[in-house]
Amino acid sequence: MLTKLDLCSMALLKLGEKPLTSLNADSASAQLARTLYDITIEALLSGHPWRFATQALSIEKNQDNEFIVPENVLRVLRCSEQLLGNQIFSNADSVKMLAVVRIDAENFPSYFVSLAATKLAMEFCIPLTGNQQNLRTLISLYESEFQNAKFIDSTTDVNPGIAQFALIDARF
């Protein structure tokens, strides 16, 4: 199972640095990993409607008779009612939404793992190495991996097939 430590170590290896043995280590690379990992991965997940991180949600009113966007939602793609901030305004009993949600590294597909490691390497590059040329190289690699990851993600949809109903049954 892939962990935060694994992803951060992959990023450090892309920089030519030694991998981490622990995120709690007392080193500059471990401190960067602790500080930047969550925000970097959340920004990467919310920056595109990744299918592997997209969920259909049904939200019920809370005890105050309000709808609140769940904490694991990074980006709302569609909502059946009016959304303002993290509140949903509706007279209905439940609200449906399609959202990009926070997921653990162990659930990342391989094409996203490489992209995430490269993005983390970009974030770690200047604080650790101070090398602008390495950063430019990582940016170029990231842009290429991002396009590839979006393509793979967009072509992995499962075709539900043709729905069953009388006209289709009569034709086929």
Predicted regions and their residues:
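Long, hydrophobic N-terminal alpha-helical segment
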Residues: 1-45
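Sparse recognition of residues in long alpha-helices and their boundaries
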Residues: 27-28, 56, 136
